[in-house]
Amino acid sequence: LGAFPPAKTMELFEALGVELKVERGRRVFPVSDKAEEIRQALLRYAQDADIVYDGAKKLLLEEVVPEAEPAPAASENPRHPKKKKAGPALRCVGVRGVSGREYRADAVLVATGGVSYPTTGSTGDGYKLAQQAGHTLVEPVPSLVSLVSRDPDCKKMMGLALKNVTLTLLEDGKAIFDEQGEMLFTHFGISGPLTLSASSHLGDMKKHRYIAEIDLKPALSEEQLYDRITRDFALLANHAAQGALVKLLPSSMQPVMVARWGIDPATKANQITREQKRELVQLVKHWQVSIDARGDLAHAVITSGGVSVREVDPKTMQSKKALGLYFAGEVLD
């Protein structure tokens, strides 16, 4: 990644004729919003490099083909019989498909992706090949994924999309992610671009407690929000509590906010005390959703975990377990 960072990736695609755009959260997409454009650019790039594809739509690999690597020779100087530093005991000389056909090669590059979103072809095949060569796997878990919450309020607001809000992810009370953008309430928890970005910062959920804290009005300070609420309530003086929130919050959130606020829904806006308005300010600026789990691998954008990077040379991406075997991309941890 140091030699080929995201900026160079963008330069590559632009050189291949793909016009790019950068959206909030530093997310990069083709201007056309068509994934097919990326696919075609990569196919052209491969064709220009004289890459030849197997005729099968999908090549099912059964195993890597290893051969024993000769032991390093001793020094030719008899007075200093030091052995050369021992390297991998195996050399990868190809792969074998489930049909039994062998593909012999000077080098094998495993770039099969992770195990998330299997409908795109990422079915975890590369992990099996890596293990055959003696590699250790870091347990694959979903990343860039929706988050599951047992909070019943999420289901009550299912389908509500929030724009221009700030999501802060708290780990044991400490902020580990903070970003402004869009998110969505679902029947199982929260989703959307902000949620996906936040999910990549989650650690071991068995060891830590996570809370998503949402600032529904990040453009306003607490004092500015208090003044805004006071003005709204003055204009809607004879409205009940929920009706008084009509200018402040989306309709599907209004009854949920009143319930969490703990105020009698029949209370008129002109009866709401200063203290109650302060409580409302805190709820709007610090709406909390407990996070109980990550979404499943089948719907994750990427996989965290995979082939241990300790067993791969970072300069060449060659396996430290078998010469001629290389790894690239999401198959790695």
Tell what function each PLM region has:
Residues L1-A49, F185:
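Conserved N-terminal/central alpha/beta ligand/cofactor-binding core
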Residues E19, H135-V141, V148-K268:
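An anion/pyrophosphate-binding glycine-rich loop and adjacent beta-alpha core
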Residues V28-S32, S143-P152, R294-E311:
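Flavin (FAD/FMN) cofactor-binding core of flavoprotein oxidoreductases
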Residues V52-G55, P255-D333:
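A glycine-rich dinucleotide-binding beta-alpha-beta segment and adjacent secondary-structure elements
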Residues S116-P118, S146-L147, I190-P193, I302, ...:
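Glycine-rich phosphate/pyrophosphate-binding beta-alpha loops
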Residues P118-V138:
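Glycine-rich beta-alpha-beta "Rossmann" dinucleotide-binding loop(s) and their flanking helix/strand
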